[in-house]
């Protein structure tokens, strides 16, 4: 999306009042998070690719006739270019509201990530 926006002669960023287009993503790979640091993505919500092995384990338990918890949560984070937004409120699958912290991204955080 960023390439298409820039190819159209537009600018990505958080200054909406001056015509910038704010990009929010769910690509928390190193490349996606680098765009957060560079100010091209304002907020990046993690969709953890490391959950695959955990899901496979749960499927094997079900196939073996074992009981598993109805809800299984994935450890994920929300990263932002700055500290403007402290948290995001969302409703979970049980119709409960929950606050999710937003972490201002730093190079140190990016360097320590597995993907």
Task: Describe these PLM feature segments.
Residues 1-34, 56:
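Hydrophobic alpha-helical
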Residues 2-5, 9, 40, 63-67, ...:
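Sec/Tat-exported extracytoplasmic proteins
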Residues 10-14, 46, 68:
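Secondary-structure boundary/capping residues
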Residues 22, 42-43, 77:
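Conserved beta-strand segments of alpha/beta enzyme cores
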Residues 38-49:
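Short beta-strand elements at the ligand-binding edges of bilobed clamshell
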Residues 47, 51-115:
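Hinge/cleft segment of the Venus flytrap/periplasmic-binding protein
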């Amino acid at each position: 999306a960023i390439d298409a926006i820039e190819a159209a002669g537009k600018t990505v960023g958080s200054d909406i009042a001056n015509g910038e287009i704010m990009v929010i993503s769910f690509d928390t790979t190193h490349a996606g998070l680098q765009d957060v640091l560079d100010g091209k993505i304002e907020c990046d919500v993690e969709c953890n690719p490391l959950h695959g092995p955990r899901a496979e384990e749960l499927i094997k338990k079900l196939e073996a006739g074992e009981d598993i918890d109805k809800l299984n949560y994935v450890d994920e984070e929300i990263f932002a270019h700055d500290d403007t937004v402290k948290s995001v409120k969302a409703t979970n699958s049980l119709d409960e509201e929950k606050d999710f912290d937003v972490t201002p991204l730093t190079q140190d955080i990016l360097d320590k990530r597995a993907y």
